[in-house]
């Protein structure tokens, strides 16, 4: 979700993530992703659907520069993510991967608040307004009812 309400209130610009002709292979022979293109603009909700092992996580990692595309590029507001310094990149986007063991004790709301980390800072304290904004995101996604449910109690799919 490229949700811009929180960003605007923190003085951070909302961003557009674009992938053009993304291709990826772990071993150079077996293609995992082929010719993937999309544009996610601020305020849009983008769903990536696929079977287990189909490359959804790989797509996200390539999209934000955690893995390098074998072919194609990812752009954040028109700039190749591989040419953006890490500090600047992570001040504009958040990536919260699925990791049930890591999030076992956290609620869904807690995990959404983790995405606010670059604005709050490592030693910063979550404010009431942060919680309200996170709940607003969950409400927008129509999953506010899961806010206080433990992530370990949710389905991985």
Annotated model-derived regions:
Residues 149-154:
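Conserved ABC ATPase signature
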Residues 128-146:
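Conserved ABC ATPase "signature" region
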Residues 49-51:
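The feature captures the beta-strand-to-loop junction immediately N-terminal to the Walker
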Residues 17-28, 74:
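Conserved beta1/A-loop at the N-terminus of ABC ATPase nucleotide-binding domains
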Residues 17, 32-35:
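Conserved structural motif at the start of ABC-family nucleotide-binding domains
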Residues 72-80, 89:
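Conserved ABC transporter NBD signature motif
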Residues 64:
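Helix-to-loop junction immediately C-terminal to a conserved catalytic motif
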């Amino acid at each position: 979700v490229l949700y811009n309400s929180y960003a605007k209130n923190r003085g951070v610009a909302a961003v557009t993530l674009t992938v053009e002709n993304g291709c990826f292979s772990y071993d150079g022979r077996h293609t995992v992703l082929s010719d993937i293109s999309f544009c996610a603009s601020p305020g849009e909700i983008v769903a990536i659907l696929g079977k287990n092992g189909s490359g959804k996580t790989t797509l996200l990692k390539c999209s934000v520069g955690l893995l390098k595309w074998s072919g194609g590029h990812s752009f954040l507001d028109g700039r190749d993510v591989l040419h953006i310094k890490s500090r600047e990149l992570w001040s504009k986007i958040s990536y919260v991967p699925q990791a049930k063991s890591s999030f076992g004790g956290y609620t869904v709301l807690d995990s959404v608040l983790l995405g606010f980390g670059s604005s709050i800072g490592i030693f910063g304290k979550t404010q009431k307004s942060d919680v309200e904004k996170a709940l607003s995101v969950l409400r927008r996604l129509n999953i506010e009812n899961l806010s206080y449910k433990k992530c370990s109690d949710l389905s991985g799919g």
